[in-house]
């Protein structure tokens, strides 16, 4: 496929809009239109109905982008920058992919990739279309929006024929062929509006934002702005770079907020506009604008240049935006506001989004333009929520900025969840699967769960208050809802698409709500299953894996006995994990679910040997012993293994520790041990780890809980010896990454001491190898469903994997049960578990933090009902939804609209690139020849060229060998969506 996008002819563009709106009530995939309320804000002698719009960038480069943004609520359009370098010359300088917006944003775009006259035509097309659409569809006043030019990068280029003509034609488009064509097409489409159309103003733009390259001298910036004010008579904003803050300020802010991995040096700070030069220049330009009766202000801010060091994007430098840029930009606003006593107008771009937009507007900072937030799932749809939030505030002409409020905003941003980077690197959001060509909607949470729980379905049931059905659905795959609803590692939440909005849906908490509210009804409905003949199972180990296996077997009709050496079932969660993590009462309820099915439980003595069990008639035996042996630290001194020590502590009823306790390790068990030590009276509790907290295997939440309770953390330390109330440690540093991807700790040769009377070794747990050996089981040798080398003996959970999570143990238990029973468990999902497509679509673009677990289904995006992340995140609208007659939504990639920015790749839940891997609609033979994508080209009549496994020309009126789903999709495109390719 080609990275070159090309404009859609205006008649085709309008045909698309009119057809889609009439059929779906949508425009370019934006689901919900914004209808203006009548409130307006004056600016540049014009009015805007909302203070928002797309910043100069990918969301304002094509007519369809601008129209989509307007439909969602944008009314101020900073159209993409033009300069003397354009078209193919510029495109060759932009590597692909060029956008990375999965978290904080990065890009390598500059100005428009179109030729300047093409860009001009796109803006004129959008201007004319919006004049009519606003009136015909009742979206707002035809005079309720403003187009703001962005030009760069030097005065010579701006005064050159190419850019100068662009400026003149944007100021008055009446003599351009494009403006005349637009009026003719619109009159043809809306003849009843011919008089209105004839009166559309050709003054597309009366204002400009000056964009300069890094290192541009202050004298050049002033010359450009002065020229635009005096020679062109344009209201003018000057865009400033974050480098004006100074290297030390920028580095300190970003480091303190977790962005210490972002690399940049001082050269841009030294070469860019300096504060001492900027202030008097802005004063002169303000005075010049005032003398001409024009408005002047500052655009804060430009993106921030940083180094590419982790293969984020191709090349060596990229430009940072989004949530990490906000604290820098708002600090710039604070300094400017104070310097000019609130009288300098500020146009904002630099991490604005739903959670801060109202505060910006209330402080007098507007217009507010956005890019990164609308490059994420929800896309342009996010604008409506921002508009609705600020509509509640008073609208009035600019009368100054509130310096105190802006200063408070700046300070607060340093600790704001929405701008802080998590301590640990973000987990992978994608699955390992490739995206299907069709029928690709999937719930990534479900794929991230080892037992593939029906998460969206039970979330919906809980949202509806159907707790009994929700718990029944949960226990079809998970017989430990209380345990997993409390301490599950919840990898599902790492995959949740809501992470791209605000925060993951609280899936684990919702499961616990279902368990607590649906338990009675479920217990009342359960009864033993009729027994299968000839099968009798013994389970050695009564921890989570053993309990789960017994549940699955008994449900399937297998006579089952579980053997546990301790007095009660529950394993490590009951005897080791502290009560503040999981209560005995919760465990008892999970055990009761299993017992309800008729499982025989034998506790308080070691299990018989495998041979003895076979002689007792057991046909299938499962080794489900937990990892009870602590890893050996191997240093001299007073050292205890974490498992035995925590078991001992759990038996204590009051604080019993004295002195200083050091826990060596960095997993969740280490966090638990450190918290236990603190709660049991230790003078101090310290975690010692040979790497840094970023490399810790522990959940970030568990680390935070430990630190909040007063546990100390010593990083880059390896214990050597404990003696005389001290722990001697080697000072470590991080070297090259090891096989796990974490950087290896390397000793520096220096040592130090910390107070320590007792060392707890929490460096990993092991299974009792002696028990395995006594039964002839060879560790590590596994067959189907984890069968061991001993006939009819299986292993699961810790005994199979080494230290495993509870849910991994459940997955093993399910596989074992299926092998014994001989078939997979089947069940039905209630109809009430499926939301309507319209309800799922209505959630797109809505940001909302968690409030209560019972309401989390309302935040669930129902990705398996409607995903469309690639549709939302494409600024050019190159991924479109095709709705089949049977109600399915299919994604089709429209090749001509794509410039391979790569943004859709970041948000596809599969290990795939929608722009390359989804079924593609081609415009020309040349386009198809330059691409390897699977897709179709309509050749006229019934003839098509289609590429799947082979590339062929077919006649749709004749029998063919196309897969039925593909043929249906092609016929639907031709029948209902021909506007995608006809010109």
Put a short name on every predicted segment.
Residues 75-87, 240-242, 359-389, 691:
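Glycine-rich phosphate-binding active-site loops on the catalytic face of alpha/beta enzymes
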Residues 540-561, 602-611, 625-633, 645-700, ...:
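Rossmann-like dinucleotide/flavin-binding elements
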Residues 1-231:
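N-terminal capping/small domains of soluble enzymes
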Residues 602-616, 631, 716-726, 732-735:
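A conserved short coil-to-beta-strand element within the FAD-binding core of flavoproteins
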Residues 22-37, 242, 246-342, 377-395:
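Glycine/Thr-rich beta-alpha phosphate-binding loop at enzyme active sites
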Residues 559-562, 566-601, 674-721:
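Rossmann-like dinucleotide-binding cores of NAD(P)H-dependent redox enzymes
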Residues 317, 323, 328, 374-375, ...:
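Ferredoxin-type iron-sulfur electron-transfer modules and their immediate structural context
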Residues 63-68, 225, 352-370:
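Catalytic cores of alpha/beta
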């Amino acid at each position: 496929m080609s990275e070159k996008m090309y404009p859609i002819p205006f008649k085709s563009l309008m045909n698309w809009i009119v057809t889609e709106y009439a059929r779906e009530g949508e425009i370019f995939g934006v689901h919900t239109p914004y209808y203006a309320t009548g409130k307006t804000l004056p600016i540049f002698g014009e009015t805007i109905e909302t203070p928002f719009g797309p910043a100069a960038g990918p969301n304002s480069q094509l007519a369809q982008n601008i129209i989509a943004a307007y439909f969602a609520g944008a009314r101020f359009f900073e159209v993409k920058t033009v300069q003397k370098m354009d078209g193919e010359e510029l495109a060759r300088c932009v590597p692909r992919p060029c956008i990375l917006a999965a978290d904080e944003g990065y890009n390598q775009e500059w100005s428009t990739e179109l030729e300047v006259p093409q860009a001009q035509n796109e803006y004129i097309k959008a201007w004319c279309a919006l004049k009519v659409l606003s009136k015909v569809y009742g979206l707002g006043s035809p005079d309720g929006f403003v187009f703001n030019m962005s030009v760069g990068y030097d005065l010579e280029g701006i005064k050159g024929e190419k850019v100068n003509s662009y400026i003149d034609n944007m100021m008055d488009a009446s003599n351009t062929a494009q403006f005349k064509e637009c009026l003719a097409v619109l009159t043809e489409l809306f003849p009843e509006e011919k008089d209105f159309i004839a009166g559309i103003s050709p003054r597309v733009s009366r204002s400009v934002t000056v964009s300069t390259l890094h290192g541009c001298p202050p004298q050049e910036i002033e010359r450009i702005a002065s020229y635009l004010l005096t020679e062109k008579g344009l209201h003018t904003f000057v865009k400033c770079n974050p480098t004006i803050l100074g290297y030390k300020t920028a580095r300190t802010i970003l480091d303190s907020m977790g962005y210490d991995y972002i690399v940049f040096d001082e050269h841009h700070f030294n070469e860019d506009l300096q504060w001492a030069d900027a202030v008097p220049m802005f004063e002169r330009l303000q005075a010049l604008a005032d003398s001409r009766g024009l408005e002047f202000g500052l655009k804060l801010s430009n993106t921030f240049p940083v180094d590419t060091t982790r293969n984020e994007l191709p090349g060596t430098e990229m430009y940072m935006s989004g949530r990490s840029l906000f604290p820098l930009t708002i600090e710039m606003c604070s300094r400017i506001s104070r310097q000019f006593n609130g009288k300098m107008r500020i146009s904002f771009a630099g991490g604005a989004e739903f959670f801060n937009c109202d505060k910006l507007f209330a402080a007098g900072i507007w217009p507010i333009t956005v890019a990164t937030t609308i490059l994420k799932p929800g896309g342009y749809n996010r604008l409506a929520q921002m508009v609705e939030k600020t509509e509640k505030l008073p609208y009035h002409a600019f009368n100054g900025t509130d310096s105190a409020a802006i200063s408070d905003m700046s300070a607060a941003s340093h600790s704001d969840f929405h701008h802080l980077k998590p301590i640990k690197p973000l987990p992978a959001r994608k699955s390992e699967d490739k995206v299907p060509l069709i029928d690709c909607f999937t719930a990534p949470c479900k794929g991230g769960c080892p037992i593939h729980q029906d998460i969206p379905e039970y979330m919906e049931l809980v949202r509806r208050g159907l707790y009994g059905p929700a718990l029944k659905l949960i226990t079809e795959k998970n017989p430990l809802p209380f345990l997993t609803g409390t301490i599950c590692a919840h990898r599902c939440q790492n995959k949740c698409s809501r992470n791209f909005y605000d925060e993951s849906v609280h899936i684990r908490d919702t499961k616990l709500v279902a368990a607590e509210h649906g338990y009675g009804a479920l217990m009342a409905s359960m009864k033993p299953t009729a027994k299968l003949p000839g099968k009798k199972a013994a389970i050695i180990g009564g921890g989570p894996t053993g309990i789960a296996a017994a549940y699955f077997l008994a449900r399937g009709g297998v006579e089952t006995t579980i053997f546990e050496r301790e007095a009660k079932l529950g394993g490590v969660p009951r005897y080791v994990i502290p009560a503040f993590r999981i209560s005995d009462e919760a465990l008892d309820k999970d055990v009761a679910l299993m017992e309800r099915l008729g499982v025989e439980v034998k506790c308080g003595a070691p299990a018989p040997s495998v041979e003895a069990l076979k002689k007792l008639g057991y046909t299938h035996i499962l080794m489900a012993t937990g990892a009870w042996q602590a890893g050996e630290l191997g240093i001299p001194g007073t050292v205890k293994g974490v498992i035995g020590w925590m078991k001992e502590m759990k038996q204590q009823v009051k604080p019993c520790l004295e002195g200083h306790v050091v826990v060596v390790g960095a997993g969740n068990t280490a966090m638990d041990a450190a918290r236990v030590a603190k709660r049991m009276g230790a003078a101090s509790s310290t975690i010692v780890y040979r790497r840094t907290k970023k490399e810790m295997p522990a959940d970030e939440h568990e680390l935070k809980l430990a630190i909040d309770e007063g546990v100390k953390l010593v990083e880059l330390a390896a214990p050597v010896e404990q003696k005389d109330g001290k722990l001697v440690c080697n000072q470590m540093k991080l070297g090259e990454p090891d096989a796990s991807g974490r950087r290896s700790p390397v000793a520096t040769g220096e040592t130090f001491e910390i107070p320590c009377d007792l060392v707890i070794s929490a460096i990993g747990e092991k299974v009792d190898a002696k028990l395995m050996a006594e039964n002839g089981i060879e560790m590590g040798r596994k067959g189907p469903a984890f069968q061991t080398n001993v006939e009819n003996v299986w292993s699961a959970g810790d005994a199979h994997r080494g230290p495993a999570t509870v849910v991994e143990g459940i997955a093993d238990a399910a596989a074992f049960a299926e092998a014994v029973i001989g078939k997979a468990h089947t069940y039905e999902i209630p109809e009430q578990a499926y939301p309507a497509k319209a309800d799922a679509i209505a959630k797109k673009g809505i940001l909302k933090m968690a409030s209560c677990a019972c309401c989390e289904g309302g935040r669930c995006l129902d990705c398996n009902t409607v995903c469309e992340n690639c549709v939302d995140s494409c600024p050019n609208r190159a991924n479109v939804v095709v709705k089949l007659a049977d109600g399915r939504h299919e994604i089709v990639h429209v090749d001509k609209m794509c410039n391979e920015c790569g943004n859709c790749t970041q948000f596809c839940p599969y290990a795939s690139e929608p722009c390359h891997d989804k079924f593609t609609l081609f415009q020309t033979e040349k386009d198809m020849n330059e691409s390897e994508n699977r897709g179709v080209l309509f050749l006229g009549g019934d003839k098509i060229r289609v590429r799947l496994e082979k590339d062929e020309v077919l006649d749709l009126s004749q029998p063919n060998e196309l897969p039925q789903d593909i043929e249906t999709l092609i016929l639907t495109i031709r029948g209902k969506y021909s506007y995608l390719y006809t010109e």
